[in-house]
Amino acid sequence: DFDLVKKGETLIIKECPSLNSELSSLIKDSRGNKTVLAIMKVGKRWNLVRETLKKEGIINTSLIALSVGMPDQIIQYASQYKKDIMPYFSLILIRFD
């Protein structure tokens, strides 16, 4: 299920933080408020994001979207992405259904 949001949901869009603690705080707030969290511009911060998603127990349910609308578009679960960096214009979608 790759919906950005479902009926009645709230979407929060944030630029990727440079600190683990900031990302953990965003995730905690979204989990508590049951909002969908989109993290933009992941790029070189992917390793930080990956470790935080693992620590929070959501690596297998979070989605990544790379090169959307392009021939090389990728939409998959974050746990499936094995490279060390992502393109600058990438998105992580975190849901708490």
PLM regions with names:
Residues S30-D97:
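A contiguous loop/helix-start segment that scaffolds small-molecule binding in enzyme catalytic cores
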Residues D1-D29:
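Class I SAM-dependent methyltransferase SAM-binding "motif I" and its flanking Rossmann-like core
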